[in-house]
Regions:
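Catalytic loop of the DD-peptidase/beta-lactamase superfamily, centered on the K-T-G motif
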Residues: 1-23, 27
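Canonical positions in the second alpha-helix
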Residues: 39, 73, 106-107
Length: 128
């Protein structure tokens, strides 16, 4: 399922979670990026957790923090269609249509059955 489990983790890993809990999103993202192997290893469900956090910010119209988190997710999980789809949505909401299109296209390239990405690109009148 989507349960997030925490294994015994080194100190480096807890720093990012503390930063997030203090609302220091960019610093938290940088801390994860700096020690990405540790975070990926020690947080099962990290991709889903970051995606959910990104959408929480997006839904609160805090697009800047959503962009930090969702971009990080594409870097940590470059083979995931969903990370590009979500980042594309945040970019679109921010008015970065050209970048949004690139991310939706990457998402569809990784998962040709991504109906949301296909729908959005069709709405934007982009050739797929």
């Amino acid at each position: 399922g989507d349960t997030i489990t925490f294994n015994k983790a080194p100190e480096d890993y807890t720093i990012s979670m503390e930063l997030f809990s203090e609302g220091k999103i960019q610093a938290g993202c940088e801390a994860i990026y700096k020690n990405k192997e540790i975070h990926i290893k020690y947080i099962n469900g990290l991709q889903n957790m970051l995606n959910a956090m990104g959408y929480n910010y997006l839904n609160e119209d805090d697009v800047e923090n959503a962009l930090h988190i969702l971009k990080l997710n594409t870097i940590l999980f470059p083979e995931s269609s969903n990370t590009y789809d979500s980042y594309g949505e945040a970019l679109r909401k921010n008015g970065n249509i050209e970048e949004a299109i690139k991310n939706y296209k990457k998402s569809i390239e990784l998962n040709p059955n991504n109906q949301n990405g296909i729908k959005v690109l069709t709405e934007l009148e982009v050739q797929i």
